[in-house]
Amino acid sequence: VYKRQHTINNKFARQMRKEIRLHEIQAPSYDCNREPVMDVNRIRELLPHRYPFQLVDKVIEIGANYIVGIKNITANEPFFQGHFPQEPVMPGVLQVEAMAQVGGLLVLNSVDEPERYSTYFMKIDGVKFRQKVVPGDTIIFRVEMLAPIRRGISTMKGYAFVGEKVVCEAEFMAQIVKNK
């Protein structure tokens, strides 16, 4: 009886910790009428990505060690043609790519003359997809640095929200490199 009860208690405690962690993560507030910190044109100046692979529409907030970016998901996104025509769902790898682009903007924002640098992602860990992203959704990305940039290497944790719900999360390691 003791061992069985102990196992049940452990499962319950794990589930409680998981629920508490999910509720501690707050979605950033987003007012679509507020002027962005970076618009799509400024993002194009900093990132090498172009349509259809530029996956950040605007940045609404930048702090010393965090950034909040936006991606509006429309029915016209090219990936919906094949993923999936009858029930369009944004591919998880593209959610992670969009989050990485927001993280790249955070890293670039920390250097002088960011146009002269690029970020390259070296590692992505702990990726979790929690909910489907579909046409009509607005993804709000919050990415924060876990430690100061050292030797051109940055570690970050990112969350993607639709409304108040976390739809994706991941940890990243990126290198900042001067362009040739």
How would you label these PLM feature ranges?
Residues 56-57, 124, 155, 169:
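Hydrophobic residues on conserved beta-strands that form the core of alpha/beta folds
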Residues 38-50, 116:
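Short aromatic-glycine motifs in intrinsically disordered, low-complexity regions
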Residues 3-25, 29-31, 35-36, 48, ...:
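HotDog/MaoC-like acyl-thioester-processing domains
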